[in-house]
């Protein structure tokens, strides 16, 4: 059931579906203050407005792009070699790291020297790096020194999505350019619940947010392949995709394929939650081929090292696992250090107990040893490891509610308070932190979760799994959770962990991954609109204009899933002629509201009157016709 070594080492190939450019799109790069800061975006070409709607040029729009070089036809993709390393010069020029002779963790050395793994192993020629003795290489440390790193400038450019260039192109598009730019740039002010979203994201603003702990850039020095991204409530809401094998299903090749598929559709981060065979090798293949940050839950692998017996876990085994993964390039660790012994009995009153795998592992350990976990007791030792590689904390909510019955109970909120205390300890070491959140929460309790997190965790970025707003829809939990995700994203959550239709039922496949990603892109974007994030509405405006003007191809291409939109349209109107028709199959040619609206506008223009006057005149004509016909509501045929 697991990986085929010969396939991976000798014939591993990229998923062809992941490297095709999206329709009418091309990869562009915006250069920063230096030539090696090249920020990727996706440019979507639009057709011109037809003469019947008053001819206009519609310049391309720019959207945030997470697909890395996979959708760039100019890039040579070979997953056996991995991606290029654009961050490596930035890391080296800081002169605060050293190259190690090889892996230093016991487990990493053991895997490297195991001849049985030779054909399975990713053939990495680069050696791992670590901070020089006494140095801190975290983005938070640089930010607090007043240093704007290339990573910070990169994410500032990325967050603005080339908005100014788009508006300038609109202004130059024709005689109505100024008016068109005003129209397409218009957006609702939004309600941000105290967030401080600026009109323009600058590198200095990024630096200040990271220094305060309100944002993080997950960027391990051993993951130079990534295109930096930022997580924080004053930035675009991000989404995380979970992948990973299990003891019963999936291979390394499938997991790499899921990663490239997830980032194609908009996954900002990916968590590898593998619990089956070859966890170390699976992770290496994923990291070397990932342009987005990769997270893990190290306790999963540590548990495998003790044959699944939680009570046999030790600090030494866990520490070795952290170093092993940090040297591979993992960008953020989920660590359930907030599961305290005194909180465990509180879960006895729950409907669904402890549903977090990491939380249940640590709860079992605490009960077996009747003392606080080694994660909690050695938290400052963990910080020392994190800052030597710039691994960010994702402080795990091991006591999150697994049903709406258990939402906002004393165990969940007790752990949240402890996570806030641990956050301040991490910040003392200049280590980046985000906080994980629930879970299963009914809609009316969601804002309380956000408010408590902001207060008790000192505005560290919140990262939530949904939350699911009802428990009655197995098979549709991407929807039950998407509702909660949109809400909590609006209230201030910085990153949303996707839920697929397979949640609670099985391991997701590629189709499920895409469904989860698209659902959560909708939730994140809806939250950006509600917060009033500058420029968030540009894409909506462009699609709405295309819809009104019956530019069908543009509607498909501007949307989050062009393939699905085109497929649905073509189910009933498959001919190419339908792609330029002024109606769809919902209303047909005679009842299309947008077509009728345009006819009213055309009539008004010909008569030299306003649309209101045209509608009034039309109503008067129809009233006269009604009286002349005998004032009968139902006419005899």
Swiss-Prot record:
Gene3D superfamilies linked: 6.10.250.620, Radical SAM ThiC family, central domain (3.20.20.540)
Organism for this UniProt entry: Janthinobacterium sp. (strain Marseille) (Minibacterium massiliensis)
Similarity annotation: Belongs to the ThiC family.
Lineage start: Bacteria, Pseudomonadati, Pseudomonadota, Betaproteobacteria, Burkholderiales
Keywords tagged on the record: 4Fe-4S, Iron, Iron-sulfur, Lyase, Metal-binding, S-adenosyl-L-methionine, Thiamine biosynthesis, Zinc
NCBIfam families: PRK09284.1, PRK13352.1, thiC
Pathway: Cofactor biosynthesis; thiamine diphosphate biosynthesis
Chain's role: Catalyzes the synthesis of the hydroxymethylpyrimidine phosphate (HMP-P) moiety of thiamine from aminoimidazole ribotide (AIR) in a radical S-adenosyl-L-methionine (SAM)-dependent reaction.
Subunit structure: Homodimer.
Gene label: thiC
Binding site for Zn(2+): 440, 504
This enzyme's EC code(s): 4.1.99.17
HAMAP family, per the entry: ThiC (MF_00089)
Residue numbers binding substrate: 242, 271, 300, 336, 356-358, 397-400, 436, 463
A Pfam entry, by short name: ThiC-associated
Protein name per UniProt: Phosphomethylpyrimidine synthase
PANTHER family hit by this protein: PHOSPHOMETHYLPYRIMIDINE SYNTHASE, CHLOROPLASTIC, THIAMINE BIOSYNTHESIS PROTEIN THIC
GO molecular function, one term: zinc ion binding
Any one of the GO BP annotations: thiamine biosynthetic process
Disulfide bonds: none
